[in-house]
Curated annotation (Swiss-Prot):
Binding positions (substrate): Y111
Composition skew (Basic and acidic residues), residue ranges: 267-278
PANTHER family, per the entry: PSEUDOURIDYLATE SYNTHASE, TRNA PSEUDOURIDINE SYNTHASE-LIKE 1
Keywords tagged on the record: Isomerase, tRNA processing
One GO BP: tRNA pseudouridine synthesis
Lineage: Bacteria, Pseudomonadati, Pseudomonadota, Alphaproteobacteria, Rhodospirillales
Function in brief: Formation of pseudouridine at positions 38, 39 and 40 in the anticodon stem and loop of transfer RNAs.
Catalysed reaction equations from the record: uridine(38/39/40) in tRNA = pseudouridine(38/39/40) in tRNA
EC number: 5.4.99.12
HAMAP family with a match to the protein in the record: TruA
Residue ranges of the TM segments: none
Name assigned to this protein: tRNA pseudouridine synthase A
A GO molecular-function descriptor: tRNA pseudouridine(38-40) synthase activity
Source organism: Rhodospirillum rubrum (strain ATCC 11170 / ATH 1.1.1 / DSM 467 / LMG 4362 / NCIMB 8255 / S1)
Length: 278
């Protein structure tokens, strides 16, 4: 058997998440069906993260074992041919050692959440952003977000159905930046609790529109009680951005609709936004 590492991009709308299940189509199922059409053997595809229904990915990493060496380029082209016309694409493939595991070898995972912060609703990005019409201040959100960085009990930001053994996680980075009409929340950690990013975003949104203060956010964290924090942000705006493995460095952030602006740079100042808000 030959093991291949895949980098996968997908639009999560219309799928019941990553993990194969009986009640609807999933990303894992689609990849496994494409792999079967390639090699004629039932193949399990393992992912770095199990994204929920409606959550997207720009850099999900997966691995699978094939019965012989096809060549990475052939694997990528064949899988993409069998995946069409689904909104799933293998954007990179590489042969790896048999001890590589997409989930257990990962050292760090990064997510980006997109909030469309304008009065007009989304058109082309419908289902790909969380639309919030009321004015929000990214700088205030970013300052408050630093309360959550570090090693904490994140019970207040954990889904009731979370299966993790412990609610304690180390959040390496949490940054909030404005990119035009959008507010981007970037989160980086070795691993996350179920719904942790969406629950943090939903709570930070309350800070951004002035309903909460940073002190209240801190109190919510320290309460270790889900009811103490804010609502769960919808899946639409969440993107599994990238995975880092041993020997790799985090990719630099790029300004753009799906990436962060470089830290310290604000493409649109908060004061300008307030003046132009209609």
């Amino acid at each position: 058997m030959v093991r291949y590492r895949l980098t996968v991009e997908y639009d999560g709308r219309g799928y019941c998440g990553w993990q194969r299940q009986d009640n609807g189509p999933t990303i894992q199922q689609s990849l496994e069906e494409a792999a079967f059409r390639l090699c004629g053997v039932a193949t399990r595809v393992h992912g770095s993260g199990r994204t929920d229904s409606g959550v997207h990915a720009l850099g999900q990493v997966a691995h699978l074992d094939l019965p012989r060496a096809y060549g990475a380029a052939t694997v990528m082209k064949a899988l993409n041919a069998h995946l069409r016309p689904q909104p799933i694409a293998v954007i990179d493939a590489a042969e790896v050692a048999e001890d590589f595991h997409a989930r257990f070898s990962a050292e760090e995972r990064s997510y980006r959440y997109r909030i469309l912060n304008r009065i007009a609703p989304p058109t082309l990005d419908q289902g790909r952003v969380w639309w919030v019409a009321r004015p929000m201040e990214a700088a205030i959100m970013d300052e408050a977000a630093q309360v959550l960085v570090g090693r904490h009990d994140f019970s207040s930001f954990r889904a009731a159905e979370c299966q993790a053994d412990s609610p304690v996680k180390t959040l390496s980075e949490l940054r909030v930046t404005r990119v035009g009409d959008e507010i981007h929340v970037f989160a980086r950690a070795r691993s996350f609790l179920h719904h942790q990013v969406r629950n943090m975003v939903g709570t930070l949104a309350l800070v951004g529109d002035g309903r909460w203060t940073a002190d209240r956010l801190r109190a919510a964290l320290e309460a270790c009680d889900r009811s103490a924090a804010g609502p769960t942000a919808p899946p639409d705006g969440l993107y599994f951005l990238r995975v880092r493995f041993p020997g790799e460095t985090a990719a630099p952030a790029k300004a753009g609709p799906l990436e962060a602006a470089p830290l310290g740079e604000a493409p649109l100042k908060e004061a300008t936004l307030k003046e132009d808000w209609r």
